A protein has these predicted regions:
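Electropositive, gly/pro-rich neighborhoods at or near active sites that engage anionic ligands
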Residues: 39-190
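Anaerobic metallocofactor- and corrinoid-dependent redox/one-carbon enzyme cores
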Residues: 2-31, 35-36, 43-44, 171-522
Length: 522
């Protein structure tokens, strides 16, 4: 078996790359290599599409292929190879001639700056593909976004100068902003604008199903299929913000949230008396104590688990819930800091409905600073930084949070400022769009740039969706971003030097020291 090379996620071995027989994420070397071949086939398809005429099916395969290779999505060689075969068939149908696939080994062997910039583009494309995939499921597409996937994939397989690649890195961020807007319109169009809601963490007695991932469409279908069946539904990890959407929260059997961040699933799912449905990442290697209760759908796949196909007939999940029966009595659970409830639903419209009050509180000195503390969570012990940082923030500051990094702080009671909770959960990782819109609206209200606001972004990253969001922030020219718990292994010293000089990108350090530095800079 050929050894792997992968350095796309934050937990990559030694912060240099996983290069043995398996990755830290649990992905085996053969799976990693097949995924590299899949990306190479996508580049071949992009070459054919740029010379020929892509169809909506071509667009769909590009998104599916990229999404399949995101960290903690697919561990199944069979489905990866099936996806590659579909892509090869489409390439032959689309392109006017013969178009070679790309060997990703050439990218890994490239000069470090070219490798770094192309990796930023590739990993950004993977994250953006996930957002476009979800929007597509709700009937929303954008021809300009679709066209960019072909342009950027073709560029990864071509000879490009560092300057050309840097421009494409920032364009990836620009197009991802449009893609997040597309998904925002899809979600709010289908389910309404999120509203603030308190979500319990206790699991009620009786049959239940846990739904993990990001796909609100899958959750809606499951809610419909379980209505009146005596089965409660609980969100997990990035599905938590679903509770804020009016068209989802109206279901009385959408009861609460199960557990904390994705990285704790192996202990939290141990002997769980209920099935778990993974609609997207993050799926960890499944342990025997619950393996018969894990179901996958869409691009998620794991050997020997039951997969729900495109027909979205969740009958096997429902039958398993009834068979397991759930807990015999109410089962109290807590957040990472001991809280028994969390809040969500503070997307842009909910927050900006209080814009006049927020502006007044800033001018009166009652709000001194805004923080965005969020992003991906993970297993590294150093991620306690984000909990400690949030706990140390002064009482005259507001915290926006989003993505699964919220679990480091979302069950804390930090009080409120004239009725506004000090912790405001904006939603899933793609709801960085909401946070951006909030920041832009505040900047307009104060007649300044976003960089002149009393606002600091303290971000955690893990997988490729965080990469595309970071590229969007760079495209927007946002400075003074703190990023951790480590810097990406795929960012070369020269590229990092550029980011530090141009954007003052700063690695997280000691939370107390960082906080003092931020507040003293005002």
């Amino acid at each position: 078996m050929r050894e792997m090379f992968c350095f796309q996620c934050q937990q990559t071995a030694h912060n240099t790359g996983c290069d043995g027989k398996a990755g830290v994420c649990g992905k085996k070397a053969d799976t990693a290599n097949y995924q590299d071949e899949l990306i190479g086939a996508l580049i071949g398809l992009a070459r054919a599409a740029r010379a020929g005429t892509p169809t909506p099916h071509t667009d769909e395969l590009i998104l599916k292929g990229l999404f399949t290779t995101i960290t903690n999505v697919n561990f199944n060689n069979e489905t990866v190879l099936q996806c590659k075969a579909e892509i090869e068939k489409e390439k032959a149908a689309v392109g006017p001639g013969q178009f070679d696939d790309y060997d990703l080994a050439a990218l890994w062997a490239a000069g470090e700056d070219v490798r770094s910039l192309k990796s930023l583009i590739l990993f950004g494309l993977k994250g953006m593909a996930a957002y476009a995939y979800h929007a597509r499921a709700l009937g929303r597409t954008d021809p300009a976004v679709n066209a960019f996937f072909y342009e950027a994939l073709e560029a990864i397989g071509a000879e490009k100068t560092p300057d050309e690649l840097l421009a494409l890195v920032l364009k990836t961020g620009e197009v991802n902003l449009a893609c997040m807007a597309l998904l925002d319109a899809a979600n709010t169009g289908a389910y309404g604008d999120p509203v603030p809601v308190t979500v319990p963490l206790t699991i009620e007695k009786g049959p239940f199903i846990v739904v993990s991932g990001h796909d609100l469409h899958d959750l809606k279908l499951l809610l419909d299929q379980t209505a009146g069946r005596g089965i409660n539904i609980y969100t997990h990890s990035e599905m938590l913000p679903a509770h804020g959407y009016p068209e989802l929260k109206k279901y009385p059997h959408l009861k609460g949230n199960f557990g904390t961040g994705w990285q704790n699933q192996q202990s939290e799912f141990h002997n769980i008396p209920a099935p778990i449905l993974f609609t997207t990442n993050c799926l960890m290697p499944v342990r025997q104590s619950y393996s018969d209760r894990v179901f996958t759908t869409s691009v998620v796949s794991y050997p020997e688990l039951t997969h729900i196909g495109d027909d979205k007939d969740f009958t096997p999940v429902i039958e398993k819930a009834l068979e397991c029966g759930g807990y015999p009595e109410d089962h109290p659970m807590t957040g990472m800091n001991g809280g028994s409830t969390v809040m969500t639903g503070f997307a842009r419209n909910a927050v900006l409905s209080h814009a006049e009050q927020i502006v007044r509180l800033v001018r009166e000195g009652k709000i001194r600073h805004f923080f965005l503390i969020g992003g991906c969570d993970g297993a590294a012990p150093t991620r306690s930084y984000y909990t400690d940082f949030a706990r140390m923030t002064p009482p005259d500051t507001l915290i926006l949070t989003l993505a699964c990094g919220k679990y480091r702080l979302n069950d804390m009671d930090l009080g409120s400022i004239e009725g506004i909770p000090r912790i405001l959960d904006c939603g899933q990782c793609n709801d960085a769009y909401s946070a951006i819109r909030i920041a832009l609206a505040l900047a307009e209200a104060f007649g300044c740039s976003v960089n002149d606001l009393p606002l600091t972004l303290v971000l955690s990253w893990y997988e490729q969706k965080a990469v595309c969001i970071l590229l969007t922030l760079l495209y927007l020219g946002l400075r003074n971003i703190y990023l951790g718990p480590t810097l990406p292994a795929f960012v070369s010293p020269n590229v990092l030097d550029f980011l530090v000089k141009q954007y003052n990108l700063t690695p997280t350090g000691d939370p107390k020291t960082d906080l003092e530095k931020i507040l003293n800079r005002q």
